[in-house]
Regions:
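Conserved catalytic core of the tyrosine transesterase superfamily
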Residues: 1-337
Length: 337
């Protein structure tokens, strides 16, 4: 079982060109399945002995643990995919996971902020950030500042420029968090204002960015250089410190590529500082990007290309969100509603 999983993960990495995020999730899900099959002190079961009843017991176990249906569905999808690969490679004659029904998930339309709400939020971004007091130091060394205030205050102020650029690119380009954190200097054409983005399945696409994102990027650029210098200085002073990653566009306080979780925390942080009743996360900005384009008359095929969707049906969910908003306006405004 473990050998089959190792081969499958390598297949995802080298043949399917799956994203690192997908590989980590699938590997974690399959290892959890192995742990269920092998309680402490028990031998590894033979691969051929695993049938649909065992897999159904595993999904029941996950339900007992309190996992959401979406999480159970993802883990079952990983198991199905593993056995499908094993059948193709001649390691099994059947795929027992196909006999286990997927949990029924509610169809949720994306909740989208209005263009006016997002524009107001982004235009007031600096003021929103200035009203906050840093909770902790994000850097141990003060970045360049003519007045030389306290390190925590200085770092918080200059990193606002990075955060502003980060928001502008998430919304202005419709990027996934993984796509934003994966951006390198070689993907950026500042003069033509275009990005080369690597999406799911390592599919590449070209996405333009507007004047607001360009202005935010230019404001962030000297901060980015300071972060690289501070990171290099930190590495010289401290042992076992990883070097900066100057090839990345968006950096953390140590000059290394910012992570997806950090992006999520920043989005939550600034939505909280704005005192708005939003359940905002990075994908909310991607939803808003698509819905606002569609509402202003953009072609659905063009939106599909900008989002990097493989199938048009994936993009069409935004038409449902737009229709829902129209119905809400109708119900509120029409005298005969």
């Amino acid at each position: 079982m473990k050998a089959a999983i190792a081969k499958y993960i390598e297949y995802l990495r080298s043949v399917r060109n799956a994203s690192p995020h997908t590989i980590v999730n699938y590997e974690s899900d399959l290892q959890q399945f192995v742990a269920f099959l092998m309680p402490p002190g028990t031998p590894e079961p033979s691969f051929s002995s695993i049938d649909h009843r065992v897999i159904r017991e595993f999904t029941g176990h996950l339900h007992d643990l309190g996992l959401q249906k979406s999480s159970i569905a993802r883990k079952l999808a990983a198991i199905r995919s593993l056995f499908k690969y094993c059948v193709r490679m001649g390691m099994r004659k059947d795929n027992p996971a196909r006999l286990v029904a997927m949990p029924k998930l509610p169809k949720r339309l994306p909740s989208v902020l209005s263009a006016e709400e997002l524009n107001t939020f982004l235009d007031q971004f600096t003021e929103i950030a200035a009203a906050a007091t840093p909770v902790r130091r994000e850097n141990k060394r003060c970045l360049s500042s003519p007045k030389k205030p306290s390190p925590a205050r200085a770092d918080a102020r200059v990193l606002v420029r990075r955060d502003r650029a980060l928001f502008e690119f998430l919304y202005g380009c419709g990027l996934r968090a993984s796509e934003l954190t994966g951006l390198n200097l070689t993907d950026l054409d500042r003069q033509e204002q275009i990005l080369r983005v690597r999406g799911k399945g390592r599919r590449e696409r070209v996405v333009p960015f507007g004047s607001k994102a360009q202005a935010a990027l230019e404001a962030y650029w000297p901060v980015r250089i300071d972060l690289i210098r501070a990171g290099a200085d930190r590495q010289r002073r401290l042992r076992n410190t990883l070097p900066p990653e100057p090839e990345a566009i968006f950096l953390n306080y140590s000059g290394r590529r910012i992570g997806q979780r950090s992006v999520g925390r920043l989005v939550k942080k600034y939505s909280r500082l704005a005192n708005m009743d939003w359940d905002l996360h990075p994908h909310s900005l991607r939803h808003a990007f698509a819905t606002h384009l569609l509402a202003d008359g953009a072609d659905l095929r063009a939106i599909q290309e900008l989002l990097g969707h493989k199938s048009l049906s994936t993009t069409q969910k935004y038409t449902h969100a737009t229709i829902r908003q129209l119905m809400e306006v109708y119900d509120k405004a029409h005298p005969r509603a």
